[in-house]
């Protein structure tokens, strides 16, 4: 069976086209949505990951992960067609990183 991105996976994906201050290019992203949603709909919710750490309040450090480094940009949620963008699994984050990302996203949404 073909790969379906799941919550907590880090995927390598092309974020172009982009506009303004959005992250762009071919880069890792943290999958937020579940495999059941992603497989059924063909889309996934994700946050880009960058190695350009700027200590912004919505950055979440990946920590000690041999496959990916940098920070998750929890305030830059994207809904992407993971099939059309050929998402490839790069690794998985810890539950602590996933929880912190979701908590920061909740702060963005709820204010």
What role is predicted for each listed range?
Residues 1-111:
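Conserved functional hotspots at enzyme active or ligand-binding sites that engage polyanionic ligands
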């Amino acid at each position: 069976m073909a790969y379906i991105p799941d919550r907590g996976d880090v995927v390598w994906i092309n974020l172009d086209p982009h506009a303004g201050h959005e992250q762009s290019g071919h880069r890792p992203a943290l999958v937020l949505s579940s495999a059941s949603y992603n497989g059924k709909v063909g889309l996934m919710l994700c946050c880009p990951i960058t190695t350009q750490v700027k200590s912004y309040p919505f950055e979440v450090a990946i920590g000690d992960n041999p496959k990916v480094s940098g920070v998750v940009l929890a305030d830059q949620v994207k809904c992407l067609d993971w099939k059309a963008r050929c998402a490839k699994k790069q690794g998985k984050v810890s539950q602590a990183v996933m929880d912190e990302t979701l908590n920061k996203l909740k702060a963005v949404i709820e204010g």
